[in-house]
Amino acid sequence: MKMLKKVICICLVAIMAAGLLPVGQTTVMAAGKPVQLVSCKVNSVGSKVTVKAKVAGIQKGMGKKLYLFSVDANVKENAKLAGKPVASANFKKGTVTFSVKYKSSMLCQKFVAAYKKGKKYIAVSGAQYITNPEALASYTGTGVKTTSKKGLQPDWADHTSVKKLRTQHVVLNWSIEEILNKDCGNKEVYKYRGKKYTFDRDRVNWLQDQVRQYIDDGSKVYVILLLGKDAKGQAGKMSYGGGKIFSSIKTSSAVGCRTWEAFMSYMAEKFGNEQHLVSGWILGNEVDSPYDWNYAGGKSLSAYMDDYARAFRIAYNATKSVSSHSKVYISLDYNWNQDVDGGGNSFFSTKNTLDTFYSKLKAQGKICPNIAYHAYSQGLVEPKFWDDSLAGSGVDSTIITMKNISVLTEYVKKKIGKDATIMLAEQAFNSTQGEELQAATYAYAYYISEGNKMIESFIYARDTEPQSDVDQGFYWGLRDSNGRERKVYNTFKVIDSKESLDKTKNLLAYTDLSSWTQIPGIKKSTFKNNRSIKNKWPLVQSTSLYVCLADDNWQRETTYVYDGKKHKPAVTVKRNYTGKTVPKKNYSVKYLTDCRSIGVHRIQIKLKGDFRGTIIREFTIAPQNAMLNDLVMTSNSATVSWNVPKKTKEQITGYMIQYTDGEGGFYSTPEKDIHLIKIKNSNKLKYTIKGLTKGKRYFVRITTYKTVMVDGKPKDIIAGWGYDDIKYDYATDPVVPEPDTEEDTLE
């Protein structure tokens, strides 16, 4: 006990020395939690966070006011917390609501309620994160539209095979330390919460090119993020070291947690747009087997999942705040109730890992995690999963393979909810018992996944077989190590085509079925609306096209001035790179708005035939502008007057005035030195700018504006800042320099 007290004292001294505790004020987490945070949401304009709490009981000394803190994700629940409250509210028994001014740093922080006792704040609630980061997203699309669940982990950067095989889902492995890397030739410095992080610009550009190519080939892209156990530099700050190959993300430390936040924030920005969209992020590999694949320092399952759930939450909030439909996945293997090391901390059963993870995640704000599951056959060598003896029919099954995959999907539906999706992210079948059996096993497994609504994709793990697999007796590839196509290669190619069931019926003889329609969810009509294997592939994706409106050039914004008439700009669709015009038979055009009022108007271009996807183009109808009448200067002020047509006054919200004392006027003055005044009154036709500096020359210009709602967020539509209607004058008479004593001469 004395030793424990000594350790605690040493830790507290270290924390205070590090400046984590403010002098004279501390916040202490309470043992009991009479207050429960029940909701934590940010508004769509990113200006306010609303936190709702339920007061179940009043602890002695709580008083009548509660205080809300935002703390970093790595701060433990039972730790002393630094900082000042971000909000306060009076409370009674029942519900209390906090309104907080949103800051970007809060995206990956958690909120805690406390009461004040002297100079201390005593925490009386658990922690909650923002649970709707998608409200902040700038990209709300879903990316490539797929028609099947067929996917592949391709050979590194091999687009040819993906295209030839008509693959609709691609899973890639990316090394974190190769991206976050200061030892590179072309550095990109990224600032996050006051600190600098160095990324390999060339590597990121190359990855963006790869993603763009896969998207253009008709595939959704998913990425497995892997951190090497020997990672160095800033990436090494997140690594535990040890284990066999990979490390879990060390979010239990302040520097590791902040680095992970910065990394995911950067990746979300780079891969959260339509052209370079990563549709899903898989955190680590088979996290229920930490020693082999996701080492976390030999922690207990509870401590390990504290760390992992924190990393998951950060990735979730960072990615969805940029791309609203992006997903985050936990990676799990097939050892459902099988603990490989018998109670040690090197391996955990899949079910216990999932349960513990979701419990930790849900406790700090309910979100919907997704699962990247590896459904290999029992023992990995024997392909016939329907003979797997350890794969039972109930939730107490030892393992879960393709034989009993419905046990997993039903469990997840009940445990997490029907919105959770399961990606079968890695499985392959051995060909040692014949290529026909390998092909039949793949077809059988794929049809099971196609018939199960909770499974979103089925990813085959090997294209070309690596020598490392062969050395272990695994002949899993669609192609052997020499590149020869096995029978499963062609089965993979046709598996989701209109002819699928006919092309694979000869493989039934190698299974325990007499018809593929014996599989739940598979009917003769299952693939009838799919594309024929005879038709062209890949379909041209919307990301490979651009749209011209009327007389616009390339993708320049098109703007009309309000005149009460409808404006429907003509649409022309062209191919990227070549500029070739797409025939009108390959798309339909629909104007989604009235095309008359002041605001942002949208056109939907729906592709068809050999083209896939939908393009939304926007154009603007802006208000008529005001005309400056006069600029009257004094020594420290300027009175601006203007006029505007009566009809325009009725249409607008008000005016914006810009002024600057920059030498070059508005042409060359930095934006930070141009001042803006917003007047929310369309009837006001005069304004006095105060606080000017005597002797300086000021430039003034004006525009009308109207505030409209776009995607639920207010947007100001301005008439435009013209360069013709600018007035300028001095705050007093300028100081005129003495003339030169010598006359100027012409040479």
What are these regions (language model features)?
Residues 165-340, 378-379, 465-470:
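Substrate-binding cleft and catalytic face of glycoside hydrolase catalytic domains
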Residues 273, 292, 433-539:
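Aromatic-rich peripheral "rim/lid" segments of glycoside hydrolase catalytic domains that contact
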Residues 304-436:
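Noncatalytic carbohydrate-binding groove/subsite architecture in carbohydrate-active enzymes
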Residues 579-612:
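Serine/threonine-rich, repeat-prone extracellular segments and beta-strand-based repeat modules
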Residues 109-118, 689-710:
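Beta-strand-rich modules
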Residues 58-74, 78, 645-670:
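Solvent-exposed loop/turn segments flanking beta-strands in beta-repeat/beta-sandwich domains
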Residues 79-102, 656-693, 707-709:
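Recognizes extended acidic, P/S/T-rich segments that occur
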Residues 32-46, 623-650, 694, 712-738:
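Pro/Thr/Ser/Gly-rich low-complexity, intrinsically disordered linker/stalk tracts
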